[in-house]
């Protein structure tokens, strides 16, 4: 039955055609690729980039209590504030804030250019095919790799406890002080629909730009197995969500969790 569902999935009959540009389901425990669509196509990955930004940031300094100054809006909140690195990391991984990614890059020794060099060096270390990073946020359409590259990025990020903790929070709540005023900050997760429905997601990151389409990367642990799901180039949020749910329910999650 599972094999039949997988065949339907790859052929595109489970949802409206056409399939996104690239779809992958990988069982890291067995080493088997269960679903692959356009696996070798080099594509922009949008804000999935921010997982690389998080890893390079943590490789440099895991202290999340140190404060940073942002000239932009972190999480679309307040300009020119002073933030802890933890708050900035939450804004980037949960709310997918681009200024948060730029703030972390600016804090790196040698600044933004050195940070980008470190991102590309990390991509080589992870053996991400045809990977290139032109900015820390994913807005740059030159941030590209293949499904295999995103898979390796996700698996590497799942080895960072801080990324596992932050990326799957349904929302973040904290107080932020600016000019003697305290403002309550609420950051809902950009992948909140799946996080509310499934409790076995251990890393997640969404992405969206016009060149990349609607993107999603997840690491899922179920029944002693570790899976990677990648969706690149969905036409809209609903299609991305529908494909992810079909993969989860038909191939990973126990049916009694529906």
Each language-model region and where it sits:
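Penicillin-recognizing serine hydrolase domain
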Residues: 17-22, 110-258
